[in-house]
């Protein structure tokens, strides 16, 4: 549940009961219990008897590694009346996503290291998940002059995109 995410799980024990676990790493696909202590999964078994501070009945739910969404629109900076880093990240977390990649079509366009830094700093301060920011390929997403891609990558941007727009002149 969301309230557990908001509290954080670093110092508590959580027992997730009766969930359908799908884990490609261990090839598990079935009904299991999961015991988490101090932010670490310590046991996955068909029936765990240990006590925990928080018990979550996951009957009818899937329990799996966090999902990654490589195309989200957080609209921050500049259009926070539509979405913010915080609200977009919260919505993603509710849906089981632990990492999102925000597209650069913001106002101003995230076409430089300062705007990349702005989003990453805001995400670190208030997002319950990993928020990554794609940099624009061209300045202002106008398709003509290349943005300073090296500086955006150095600032932590893992991808570049025009988010559906064409690059008209790559020279």
Name the predicted role of every residue range.
Residues 106-117, 122-171:
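Histidine/acidic-residue-rich, glycine-tolerant segments that coordinate divalent metal ions
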Residues 12-15, 20-66:
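Histidine-rich, glycine-flanked metal-binding segment
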Residues 22, 103, 163:
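Conserved residues at the C-terminal ends of beta-strands
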Residues 58-123:
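Metal-associated gating/positioning segment near the N- to mid-region
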Residues 11-13, 51-53, 59, 63, ...:
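Short coil/turn connectors at secondary-structure junctions
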Residues 19, 39, 60, 71, ...:
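Divalent metal-coordination and catalytic microenvironments
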């Amino acid at each position: 549940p969301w309230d557990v995410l908001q509290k954080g799980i670093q110092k508590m024990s959580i027992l997730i009961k009766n969930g359908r676990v799908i884990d490609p790493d261990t090839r598990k696909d079935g009904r299991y219990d999961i015991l988490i202590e101090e932010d670490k999964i310590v046991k996955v078994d068909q029936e765990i008897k240990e006590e925990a501070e928080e018990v979550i009945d996951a009957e009818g739910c899937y329990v799996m590694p966090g999902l990654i969404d490589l195309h989200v629109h957080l609209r921050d900076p500049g259009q926070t009346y539509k979405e913010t880093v915080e609200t977009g990240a919260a919505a993603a977390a509710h849906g089981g996503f632990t990492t999102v990649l925000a597209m650069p079509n913001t106002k101003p366009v995230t076409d430089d290291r300062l705007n990349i830094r702005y989003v990453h700093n805001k995400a670190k301060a208030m997002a319950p998940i990993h928020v990554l920011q794609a940099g624009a390929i061209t300045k202002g997403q106008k398709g003509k002059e290349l943005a300073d891609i090296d500086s955006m990558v150095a600032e932590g941007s893992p991808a570049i995109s025009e988010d559906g727009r064409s690059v008209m002149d790559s020279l």
